[in-house]
Amino acid sequence: MIKRLEISSPKIKTDKKLLLISDIHKNKNHKKDNLIKLKEEIKNEFKYIDYILISGDLIDTPKDLVDEEFIKELKYYLEEFTEGKKTYIALGNHDIDGNNIEEEYLYNILKEIKNIKCLNNTETINIRDISIQGFTPNIDYYRKHHGNKNEYKIQFEEHKTEKNDKNKYNILITHDPSSIIELNMENKEIINKNIDLVISGHMHNGLVPQKLQKIMNHKGFVGPYKKVLPKYAYGIIKINETNFIILGAVNSMIKMPVVNKLYGYDATILTLKKVK
């Protein structure tokens, strides 16, 4: 399902279209995936997309990166999909949880693709009236502290990007939405840093089929690490002055036709509009 959203802000000087995707879970054993179908569905709109933002889990496991053929296929796959459009990525748990394979390995592979920028925890991309940052907590957050907002806060406060310009529309890409939403609800000054929009994924819509999402009102059935009834599993949520967009998955981790048919693929075309 392609969702279309609009957000207006006095900080936006010229309208922009962003393609937002998450949880692609590319792996070497699954050749046909939903990213191809997604691209076909939006082919008439794609030329109007200004930037592509990917909020993690680009691959299923870094273990596949020991295969040179998979690396070549991954590069070609991303180049074909993005068609040279500026693309910004923050890594997810599946991108960095590879036992002895360091997260820098994927980061270095992505650096070889000219139009793609994998954002580490120190960079701010300034593009006229917007800025884009990425935040990836370390793998211990996912393995030992998943959903622990205090651990997330410690790591986020070490997030060494330059101070956000309050006159720009500031976007943060991060994979897991749960902790940052809860922190923002408690005290907007802790986590806000003048952030206007947070793009995340990770939740796979809480395994709620698309037809039931309006009824469930952002809640999921099951979240990552078998968490039951997560509060924030999909959709757009505004807390204080920050909008949070929780994306569903492009590809399910369960590679079965019946699952794929039930849940489909998920992407959002977001228009940032200037206030007239």
List the model feature ranges, each with a label:
Residues 1-75:
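N-terminal active-site segment of His-dependent metallophosphoesterases
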Residues 6, 73-159, 229, 236-240:
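Extended active-site neighborhood of metal-dependent phosphoesterases/phosphodiesterases
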Residues 8-19, 115-116, 123-134, 164-171, ...:
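Beta-strand-turn-beta hairpins that frame and shape the catalytic cleft
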Residues 23-27, 47-69, 84-106, 130, ...:
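Active-site neighborhood of divalent metal-dependent phosphoester/pyrophosphate hydrolases
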Residues 25, 58-59, 93-95, 123-124, ...:
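Catalytic metal-binding/acid-base residues of hydrolase active sites
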Residues 34-37, 66-77, 102-107, 185-191, ...:
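Charged helix-capping and loop-helix junction motifs
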Residues 39-40, 114, 127-174, 178-190, ...:
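Binuclear metal-dependent hydrolase catalytic cores centered on His/Asp/Glu-rich metal-binding motifs
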Residues 178-267:
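Conserved beta-sheet core of the metallophosphoesterase superfamily
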